[in-house]
Design a protein with these regions (language model features):
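Glycine-rich beta->alpha junctions and the first turn(s) of the following alpha-helix
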Residues: 79, 154, 265-356, 422
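Glycine-rich phosphate/cofactor-binding loops in nucleotide/flavin-utilizing enzymes
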Residues: 1-65, 148, 168, 401-431
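A short, Trp-centered hydrophobic/proline-enriched beta-strand micro-motif
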Residues: 192-202
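Internal helix-loop-helix
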Residues: 56-63, 91, 121-193, 235-238, ...
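C-terminal helix-coil-helix/basic helical segment that borders enzyme active sites and/or dimer interfaces
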Residues: 102-107, 333-336, 352-385, 398-403
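Short, contiguous pre-domain boundary segments
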Residues: 63-79
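A short core secondary-structure module
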Residues: 227-264
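A structural signal for short hydrophobic beta-strand segments in well-ordered beta-sheet cores
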Residues: 215-218
Length: 431
């Protein structure tokens, strides 16, 4: 396989060299156009070849399932010492790294390369991997995952979505993956931090319903194939592995797909999530594995994804509140800070009330899920509240800053755009 790839790369380079050296390009005044086209084409082609060479070979491991939290008899909002330390570390990272990178990342619509090294240093993926595979997860840590998402999102919503994409896929594979899926992918995630993964869930459909999918899965001689289109895929252009939602046997299901030549990838910048490099993916009879088996619960899968977006919305709303408090205390009008005006003070007070309400619902749903109890109702209510109130907080943040809030001089307009994803996206992450 490696020899074949090397030959393909060699042939491609020789062909590009011959075309670029042709005098005909100068005569027809096409050199600049052709060179640009060759650059883009070769860049995409070699990216696909490089990804194809990444080997995912099954290893002999036992099927992993993390036990539910056994001591969850009461809903307790107090954090454990470990959770508090994790929140402090993630909040510090969000403030010192994510916040400083966010403006340029959004402006250039590009996920910063240096963040991958930071992710390795944080060891975030090991929070999702079971102890048997070298990770630190000994039981369901859904509440801790929610707290991590909230803490990171205080720095930036889009960058957090990118950082948590592989982490979320590992969570999903650990919780739902069949023996075949786990043996093929989890050891690779444990050993190689350069392997990345994401979710291809959203479809180009008005009022998208995750239980009514246009993407289809078919089975032929025990092999699954995916056909359809997905949009707003976080880091879709660089991921090695995708978790794809598709209809199979008349029901929605989740499949594992490796990046290959049957997937057409197109950059698709959106109103928000610019730093997450969202893309549209077209699957054309793409080989796939079914994620779960007998214990897979599609509804719970969707709910756990929605809770992560809610947690990120809470973190970003906290950032808006803190920024507005600082601005309102420093900005003077008519000889006094604008925070002395009740219209401004009440808006900030409402932010605090709504953030606490959102956090309460999200943690309640996560706590039930962690204990292995039904949590669909609570997750649904949490998403409804977060979708509505996060946009209100984003709007009020822009309003408090007035004309400044509408400019890129301040981050509130970016937070406002990113928060819109809370109401639009389903799944795409996993607690």
């Amino acid at each position: 396989m490696s020899n074949m790839m090397n030959k393909a790369q060699g042939f491609g380079l020789s062909l590009i060299t011959k075309i670029a050296g042709s005098e005909m390009l100068d005569q027809l005044k096409l050199r600049k156009f052709v060179e640009k086209s060759l650059y883009q084409g070769s860049k995409t082609g070699f990216k696909v070849l490089t990804k194809t060479q990444k080997a995912f070979k099954p290893q002999a491991i036992d099927k992993q399932r993390l036990p539910n939290q056994s001591n969850k008899n009461l809903f307790d909002l107090s954090l454990t010492e470990e959770q508090q330390m994790t929140c402090d570390a993630m909040s510090q990272f969000a403030e010192e790294v994510l916040y400083t990178l966010a403006h340029d990342a959004d402006h250039h619509a590009q996920f910063p390369e240096e963040l991958w090294q930071h992710l390795t240093d944080l060891g975030l993926n090991y929070y999702a991997l079971p102890e048997a595979l070298g990770g630190v997860a000994a039981e369901q840590n859904i509440v801790s995952n929610i707290l991590i998402a909230e803490s990171l999102a205080k720095g930036d919503f889009s960058l957090t979505a990118g950082l948590l994409s592989t982490f979320s896929v590992i969570n999903a594979m650990t919780r739902w993956g069949s023996t075949q899926v786990q043996s093929m992918y989890l050891p690779v995630f444990a050993e190689d931090p350069d392997v990345t993964a994401t979710f291809a869930f959203q479809e180009v459909t008005p009022a998208f319903n995750p239980f009514q999918l246009k993407t289809k899965a078919t089975e032929q001689n025990g092999q699954f194939y995916i056909t359809g289109e997905k949009t707003l895929v976080v880091l879709g252009d660089t991921a090695d592995v995708f978790l794809v939602s598709a209809e199979w046997n008349g029901k929605p299901d989740i499949f594992v797909v490796q990046c290959d030549e049957t997937i057409a990838i197109k950059a698709n910048p959106a109103m928000g999530l610019k730093a997450a490099e969202t893309a549209t993916l077209q699957f054309n009879q793409t080989p796939a594995l079914r994620l779960g088996d007998t214990d897979f619960d599609y509804t719970a899968f969707v709910d756990l994804g929605n809770l992560m977006w809610c947690a990120m919305a809470i973190g970003t709303c906290e950032a808006i509140k803190a920024y507005c408090i600082k601005y309102a205390n420093e900005r003077t009008a008519f000889g006094e800070p604008i925070s002395h005006r009740q219209s401004v003070a009440f808006m900030i007070a409402d932010m605090a009330i709504e953030i606490d309400a959102m956090r309460m619902l999200v943690l309640n749903a996560a706590s039930l899920a962690e204990a292995g109890q039904p949590f669909h109702r609570e997750a649904y209510l949490a998403r409804l509240l977060c979708a509505e109130k996060s946009m209100k907080i984003g709007t009020d943040g822009v309003q408090i800053l007035g004309g400044h809030g509408f400019t890129k001089e301040h981050p509130v307009e970016r937070w406002y755009r990113d928060l819109r994803a809370t109401a639009i996206l389903h799944s795409g992450l996993h607690a």
